UniProtKB/Swiss-Prot annotation:
Organism: Lactococcus lactis subsp. lactis (strain IL1403)
Subcellular location: Cytoplasm
Location (main, coarse): cytoplasm
A single Gene Ontology CC term: cytosol
Pfam families: Anticodon_1, tRNA-synt_1, Val_tRNA-synt_C
UniProt xrefs under InterPro entries: aa-tRNA-synth_I_CS, aa-tRNA-synth_Ia, Anticodon_Ia_Val, M/V/L/I-tRNA-synth_anticd-bd, Rossmann-like_a/b/a_fold, tRNA-bd_arm, tRNAsynth_Ia_anticodon-bd, Val-tRNA_synth_C_sf
Name under which the protein is recorded: Valine--tRNA ligase
GO terms of biological process kind: valyl-tRNA aminoacylation
Binding site for ATP: K523
UniProt cross-references to SUPFAM superfamilies, sorted A to Z: Anticodon-binding domain of a subclass of class I aminoacyl-tRNA synthetases, Nucleotidylyl transferase, tRNA-binding arm, ValRS/IleRS/LeuRS editing domain
CDD domains: Anticodon_Ia_Val, ValRS_core
Reaction(s) this enzyme catalyzes, per UniProt: tRNA(Val) + L-valine + ATP = L-valyl-tRNA(Val) + AMP + diphosphate
Length: 880
C-alpha cells in the first residue's frame, strides 16, 4: 500500500468502498470484552415511508459520533439499528401508489393489500440502509430489528394483555380525534393545531310554542345536526324564563331542551351554547353531566350520515355550505363574522380532524404517568440534555390524558382481542381455542410498539436474553424535541412498568434543520434538501462536520452551502497537511516515533516548539473529551478546528521548517516523529465526526496499524506538558503576529528588512528562539535585551512579557502612531472592564472553580501590564 495521498482531496474516491470494508471487518459489532463497560444506543427507527431527509442525517450523525468515540475509548459498544412500520403513514403511501393504477385497498382485501405494503417496506428498507451506508453509520446489522418482527410482536401482545388484565387498557365509547381521510382515530398529540381563516355563524333557534328565538354562534354550523340541547348559565337573568323549555332545531325540526350549566359563559357571545355531544369534547362533558343523548351525524369518511336528513351523503364542508344557504333562506342565519382561529389537522394526512364519538381502545395514563414522574426524583432518573427538556417531559406527564391506541388500519399490530357471536370478548397473547372467534380488525397505534423499542429489541420479554442482560438499560437516546411527547415519554413509562428501569440513562435532544432563512424545511415551501445530493457534491465527512459543528443540544441548525464549502475546505486543509507530513516522514516506524517522543518528554531531544505543540495537543484532548462527554459537539468541533488550523497547521508546521530545512538529521527525526504523532492524534479525535477521510489517512501513517475505527481514543499524557514551553511559544507567536500587523499598517512588506528591538524580562528565551523570529519577521538587525533605549520614531506593540519596537523613521507619522496606540489603549481598557466586572461578581467568585477564578485574575494582571505600557508609550511620544 502506498503511503502517498492524492494531490487533491476527492471525497468520492476516498469514500468509495470504505463502508463495505468496515462491514467485512466486523468492526461495528460489540467487542465482546466482558471486562469492558457496555455502552448501547438503539437507533430511533426511521419510518419505512420513503427516503431519509436531512433531519435523519443529523440524528444518525450525532449517534454515530457518540458510539464511535465510545468504541475507541474501549467501551463494549452496541448501536442497534432498525425501522418502524409507521402504520398510518405507510398505509397512506401504499394506498396512494395503488390509486395511481385506479386500485383501492378494499379492491384487494386485507391480506393482498398487506402483501403490497410488505413489498413497499422491503423496497424502502433497502434504500434506507444504502443511505445509512453513505452516511457511514457504524451500526451492528446482525441485530437489525423491525417493529413488526415476530419477537417485537410478541412483546407488543404481552404488554397489551398485561395492561388489560390490570385494568389499564379498556375499550369504550369516547370522544376522539377522527381523521376522515385515513378513516382512523388519532391521539391528541397526532393532531396539529393550525391557525386558519374561518367564520362565526350566528344562527337562531326558535323556542317551542313561542315566537321567541335564541341566538347561538358556531364555527361548524353543520354540527347542529347532532345537537341534543342548548345551555345557559343559571346566573344569566336574560334567559331564566327559558330554562326548562325547548327549542326547535331549524330544518330538521328536532326538539331539544334548554338547560343550565356552568360551561355557558355569560360574557362570551350571546351566552347561549349549542351542545353537540358526539362532536365536541366540552359538549361531551356537558352531556355526561346531564345524561343527554349523543347523536353521531358523520360517517367515517367525513360525509353526513342518516342522522343528517336531507344532507345525508354530502361531504362535511359541502354540507356546511348547503346548511348555511338553507338557514339564510329561512331567515335564521343572523350574521357571519370572519375569525382567525386554531383548527386541529391530522399530523399524517393534513386534513381537518373531526372530534367524533367512537368505540376505541384506550390506555389509562394516571398510574403510568405517576410512576414516570416519581422516577425522575430517583437515581434512575433520565438525564435530559439540555436540562430544560426535563421540564417539558414533566409538564406533559402531569397533564396527560388517556391514550387512544386503536387505529382503523390494516398495517400494524392487530389488537389481540377476539369476539364471538354470543357477545363475549377474549383478550390474550394467542387466539382462543375453539371456533366462532373473530379477531378485532383494528391495529395498535404505531407509537404503542415504538414505546417498547429499547427493551423489545434486546430480547424482552425474555429477561434472560444475553443482550437484555448486557445492554439494557441503554446508555443514550438521541432524538428531536418534536417527539418528546410521541415517543420519549412513552418509552419511559412503558419501560418502568415492564422492566422496572428507565430505558436509557441520557436523552440528547436536538432541534430541527432549517433553511438559510430559518424556515422549517417542507414540501410545500420546496426548500427540502436531500442529504444524498449534499454527499455527492461534498462527501459525507463534510456533511457530518457541518451537522456536528453547528450543533448544540436542543438548538435548531440552519443549513448553508457556504458552511458546506467551509467544511470541505477544512478537510482539504487537513488533507494537504497530512500529505506534507507523509512526504517528509514516510519511513519512520512506530517504535522510532515512541522513542523520539520519550526523548522530547525527558527534554533530552527536541526543541521548545515540539514541547509546545505536545502541550497544546494535551489541552485539546482534555477539552474536546470534556465537551464530547457533555454532547457539546459544536464546542468540541471549534476547539479541534482552532487547534488543527491555527496551532498545528499555521504555526507548528511552519515553525518546523526551521528544522526541516536545516542540516541536523537527528533533530529532523524528532520533528518528523512529533509531526506524525500529532497528526495521528488529530485523526483519532476527528474520526468519530468524520470517519471516511480519517481512515484513509490513518492507514497510510507509517506508525499505525489496523483500522482507526477500533484505535484507542487520545488521552492526556502528562509527561508531555511543559508550561514554560507553552508560555514561551505563545509569546513568540504573539510577537510575530504583532510585527506582521505593524508592517501591514505602514505598508512595509515582509521582504523589506527593517530593524527590530525587543525589550523583555524573557530576553534569554527570545534570544534562544531568535532564528524563528528572524525567519518570520525578516529584521535587518535584531536586538533583544532586558533593558534598552527606546527609539523616538518607532512603531511599538505590547505583548505578553515583552515590548516590541520597529524604528521606521520616515515611514511613520507620530500623530498617527499616537492615534493607533490610543485605539490599542481603549482595547485593553475594555478587556480590563470585562475582567473587573466578572471578578466583582460575588456569585461568580463564590461558585466558579478556583482555577477559573485564578485564570481571570491572571488575565487582569496581564491586561493591566499591557494597558500601563501602552499608556506610558503614548506619553513618551507626546513629550517628544
Amino acid at each position: 500500500m502506498t503511503n502517498e495521498l492524492t494531490p487533491k482531496f476527492n471525497p468520492t474516491e476516498v469514500e468509495a468502498g470504505r463502508y463495505e470494508k468496515w462491514l467485512e471487518a466486523d468492526v461495528f459489532k460489540p467487542s465482546g470484552n466482558p471486562d469492558a463497560e457496555p455502552y448501547s444506543i438503539v437507533i430511533p427507527p426511521p419510518n419505512v415511508t420513503g427516503k431519509l431527509h436531512l433531519g435523519h442525517a443529523w440524528d444518525t450523525t450525532l449517534q454515530d459520533i457518540i458510539i464511535r468515540q465510545k468504541r475507541m475509548q474501549g467501551f463494549d459498544t452496541l448501536w442497534l439499528p432498525g425501522m418502524d412500520h409507521a402504520g398510518i403513514a405507510t398505509q397512506a403511501k401504499v394506498a396512494a401508489r395503488l390509486a395511481e393504477d385506479g386500485i383501492l385497498p378494499q379492491d384487494l382485501g386485507r391480506e393482498k393489500f398487506l402483501d403490497k405494503v410488505w413489498e413497499w417496506k422491503d423496497e424502502y428498507a433497502t434504500t434506507i440502509k444504502e443511505q445509512w451506508g453513505k452516511m457511514g453509520i457504524s451500526v451492528d446489522y446482525s441485530r437489525e430489528r423491525f417493529t413488526l418482527d415476530e419477537g417485537l410482536s410478541q412483546a407488543v401482545r404481552k404488554v397489551f394483555v398485561q395492561l388489560y388484565n390490570k385494568g389499564w387498557i379498556y375499550r369504550g365509547e369516547k370522544l376522539i380525534n377522527w381523521d376522515p381521510k385515513a378513516m382512523t382515530a388519532l391521539s391528541d398529540i397526532e393532531v396539529i393545531h393550525k391557525e386558519i381563516d374561518g367564520a362565526f355563524y350566528h344562527i337562531t333557534y326558535q323556542i317551542e310554542g313561542s315566537d321567541e328565538f335564541v341566538e347561538i354562534a358556531t364555527t361548524r354550523p353543520e354540527t347542529f345536526l347532532g345537537d341534543t340541547a342548548v345551555i345557559v348559565n343559571e346566573k344569566d337573568e336574560r334567559y331564566k324564563h327559558l330554562v326548562g323549555k325547548n327549542v326547535i332545531l331549524p330544518i330538521i325540526n328536532r326538539v331539544i331542551p334548554i338547560l343550565t350549566d356552568d360551561h355557558a359563559d355569560m360574557e362570551k357571545g350571546t351566552g347561549v351554547v349549542k351542545i353537540t355531544p358526539a362532536h365536541d369534547p366540552n359538549d361531551f362533558e356537558v352531556a355526561m353531566r346531564h345524561d343527554l343523548p349523543m347523536i353521531n351525524m358523520m360517517n367515517n369518511d367525513g360525509t353526513i350520515n342518516e342522522n343528517g336528513g336531507k344532507y345525508e351523503g354530502l361531504d362535511r364542508f359541502e354540507a356546511r355550505k348547503q346548511i348555511v344557504a338553507d338557514l339564510k333562506e329561512l331567515g335564521q342565519l343572523v350574521d357571519i363574522k370572519p375569525v382567525r382561529h386554531e383548527v386541529g389537522h391530522s399530523e399524517r394526512t393534513g386534513v381537518v380532524v373531526e372530534p367524533r364519538l367512537s368505540t376505541q381502545w384506550f390506555v389509562k395514563m394516571d398510574e403510568l404517568a405517576k410512576n414516570a414522574i416519581a422516577n425522575q426524583t430517583t437515581e434512575d432518573a433520565v438525564e435530559f440534555y439540555p436540562p430544560r427538556f426535563n421540564d417539558t417531559f414533566m409538564q406533559w406527564m402531569e397533564n396527560v390524558h388517556d391514550w387512544v391506541i386503536s387505529r382503523q388500519l390494516w398495517w400494524g399490530h392487530q389488537i389481540p382481542a377476539w369476539y364471538n357471536e354470543a357477545g363475549e370478548m377474549y383478550v390474550g397473547e394467542e387466539a382462543p381455542e375453539g371456533e366462532g372467534w373473530t379477531q378485532d380488525e383494528d391495529v395498535l397505534d404505531t407509537w404503542f410498539s415504538s414505546a417498547l423499542w429499547p427493551f423489545s429489541t434486546m430480547g424482552w420479554p425474555d429477561e434472560n436474553s444475553a443482550d437484555f442482560i448486557r445492554y439494557f438499560p441503554t446508555s443514550t437516546l438521541v432524538t428531536g424535541y418534536d417527539i418528546i411527547f410521541f415517543w420519549v415519554s412513552r418509552m419511559i413509562f412503558q419501560s418502568l412498568e415492564f422492566t422496572g428501569k428507565s430505558p436509557f440513562h441520557n436523552v440528547l435532544i436536538h432541534g430541527l434543520i432549517r433553511d438559510e432563512e430559518g424556515r422549517k424545511m417542507s414540501k410545500s415551501l420546496g426548500n427540502g434538501i436531500d442529504p444524498m445530493d449534499v454527499i455527492e457534491k461534498y462527501g459525507a465527512d463534510a456533511l457530518r462536520w457541518f451537522l456536528s459543528n453547528g450543533s448544540a443540544p436542543g438548538q435548531d441548525v440552519r443549513f448553508s452551502y457556504d458552511k458546506m464549502d467551509a467544511a470541505w475546505n477544512f478537510i482539504n486543509k487537513i488533507w494537504n497537511v497530512s500529505r506534507y507530513i507523509l512526504m517528509n516522514a514516510e519511513d519512520i516506524s512506530a517504535d522510532a516515533v515512541s522513542s523520539a517522543l520519550t526523548k522530547v518528554a525527558n527534554k533530552t531531544a527536541g526543541n521548545v516548539t515540539d514541547r509546545w505543540i505536545l502541550t497544546r495537543l494535551n489541552d485539546t484532548v482534555e477539552r474536546v473529551t470534556e465537551q464530547m462527554d457533555k454532547f457539546e459537539f459544536g464546542v468540541a468541533g471549534h476547539i479541534l478546528y482552532n487547534f488543527i488550523w491555527d496551532e498545528f497547521a499555521n504555526w507548528y508546521l511552519e515553525l518546523t521548517k526551521e528544522v526541516m530545512f536545516g542540516e541536523d538529521e537527528a533533530e529532523k527525526d524528532i520533528t518528523r516523529a512529533v509531526l506524525l504523532h500529532v497528526l495521528d492524534q488529530v485523526l483519532r479525535l476527528l474520526h468519530p465526526i468524520m470517519p471516511f477521510f480519517t481512515e484513509e489517512i490513518f492507514e497510510k501513517l507509517p506508525n499505525t496499524s489496523g483500522s482507526i475505527v477500533v484505535a484507542e481514543y487520545p488521552k492526556v499524557r502528562p509527561e508531555f506538558n511543559d508550561d514554560k514551553a507553552s508560555e514561551g511559544v505563545a509569546m513568540l507567536i504573539e510577537l510575530i503576529t504583532a510585527v506582521r500587523n505593524i508592517r501591514a499598517e505602514v505598508n512595509t512588506p515582509l521582504s523589506k528588512a527593517v530593524p527590530m528591538l525587543i525589550k523583555s524580562e524573557h530576553a534569554d528565551f527570545l534570544n534562544a528562539v531568535s532564528p524563528y523570529i528572524s525567519r518570520f519577521t525578516n529584521p535587518s538587525e535584531l536586538t533583544i535585551a532586558k533593558d534598552l533605549a527606546v527609539p523616538e520614531q518607532a512603531m511599538s506593540a505590547v505583548i505578553t512579557g515583552a515590548e516590541l519596537y520597529l524604528p521606521l523613521a520616515g515611514l511613520i507619522n507620530i500623530e498617527e502612531e499616537i492615534a493607533r496606540l490610543e485605539k490599542e489603549l481603549a482595547k485593553w481598557q475594555k478587556e480590563l472592564d470585562l475582567v473587573n466586572k466578572k471578578l466583582g461578581n460575588e456569585r461568580f467568585v463564590a461558585n466558579a472553580k478556583a482555577e477559573v477564578v485564578q485564570k481571570e485574575k491572571d488575565k487582569l494582571a496581564d491586561y493591566q501590564e499591557k494597558f500601563d505600557t501602552v499608556k506610558a508609550r503614548i506619553a513618551e511620544l507626546k513629550e517628544n
